[in-house]
Amino acid sequence: VSNEQTSPVDPQAEVAPQVASHSLKHAVILGSIGFVAACLSSLAVGAMGEVFTLPPEIVQLGVGAVPGGDTQKIIVAASIAVFYRNSALWLATTGIIVGGLFGFVGGHGNNKSRIVRTVCAVIAGAAFGAAAGIHAVYYGEKCLELLKTGPLSVPESMVMQLHGTTWLIFGLGIGLGSALGSSQRRSAINKIAQGMLLGGIAAAVGGVLYPFVAGIAIPLIDPSIPIPLESNNRLLWMSLPCAILGLALGRRS
């Protein structure tokens, strides 16, 4: 009779690799969904164009206006106000698309929890997206004010802050929406905090990386524009944060 004893198998040791593999697979799926959402968002924003425009009476004021005069200041102020509204609408639309896709595909649970999660992600994405759009224009105004003082271009650190903070706000909303729809309510507060923190940081990383990647991929563009209007530039600006955001939220799930 053999005296050898077989060591007991640790169930956790067998499950851990499977969990890690599933988590990685889910991260890749959500990262891909993030890229698709960015493509759809860029197309939607391009199709929408400038929904809000200058009133005809303001446009008429610009005919023959003296540069630097009071009339010119009124036109500039009105143009900025229009850009605020368009930017809020553009990123709110982006938040709806990204939040909706992440909410529908991400996470677990039955059909009811999937619907709840999607609705929460759409609402939070729209609200925080609009806030991100407003912030982008506000910070963009700071960049313009800096250029008036003498520098020929906006410092890289300021450009990184512009896009990083804009996407930070956006990511907070997507992370919040994903956590609000969770079917597990015992640790709801922790899940919300983790979701917002992870979403905000992940999207901010994509925003910070954008100027560097854009400088290589599209070297002739101006990275200090708050919300890029050129299609390829806008797609790059949206896809980096959304893809990284998807990877992060998918890994957490």
Regions inferred by a protein language model and the residue ranges of each:
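Juxtamembrane/disordered regions of integral membrane proteins
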Residues: 2-253
